[in-house]
Amino acid sequence: GGMVPVLAGLYVGGAESCSSPEALSAAGVVAVLTVDAEEPPAVPGVRAMHVRARDEPGADLLSRLDECAAFLAAARAGGGAALVRCHAGVSRSVAVVAAYLMKTQGLGCEEALAAVRAAKPDAQVNPGFQGQLELYEAMGCSVDTSSVLYKRYRLEMLSERFSEPQDLPREVFAVDPTTICQTLNTEVLYRCRKCRRALFRSSSILSHMEGMGPTAFAHKRITDSARLSGNSQEKCTSYFIEPVQWMEPALLGVMEGQLLCPKCMSKLGSFSWRGDQCSCGRWVTPAFQIHKSRVDEVRTLPIGNFLTAKT
């Protein structure tokens, strides 16, 4: 668990790497980033950042990778060194260092992991972190919370965390389109075919690859899902979308159920945190599906504010 240099001014290590303040100052370490379930005691005169995570495939490092990189870059920019540490110095700290190399040195996921292994042969990230690093690479090494890839990842992580969903974090819900003004919007709007209530926008559609098998997510390789097909899937009879604010009452405390129009209560589709199969054969987890036959597409014309329904 001692400190091992990966780059000039960047060290990786385990729990013991901070046991000697003398060793830290001898190495010029001015900042320590700890990725562990518990926050360690502070070392005097050393900047500290803590990311709470266990070494489990279901732990989320991805959403914190940009913050981690900024913290490490700031320490090194001032001429000091930074140490990234976890308990064993094998998986969590290695994943964060690899992400930093990807973002700052332009390395791909495999190259970055190989670079850390060259310095520390026992380095071995768990399969969940491997998938998160691939996803980070697919997003151009910056966490884009509006991207389809990230939205799907976040929902997948949520679905694995609970057997009975209680309260869902606000950020997983798309804003109800009835609450936003319609002008200057190039997005397509989807509304209930029966009562015309606006339900969701095209940016909420989480497209998937056609065909058999599960969608590739955190624990699997995501290289497939990076090559997403567009929304022109002929074989798919449903739209799979992110949750929208109006669905919240239906989702509380249950694993699956129907999705009804909040205005006229006609059946639009269904949801399941365990996942559901699309008509094209692809298994999607979790699934929030709206039958295409139950909604109309509305395109906003760039001139003025007239809505034109696609017949």
Regions found by a protein language model. Give the residues of each.
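Short polar/charged helix/loop
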Residues: 18-22, 37-42, 47-78, 103
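Short cysteine-rich clusters marking metal-coordination/redox-active sites
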Residues: 192-195, 260-264, 277-280
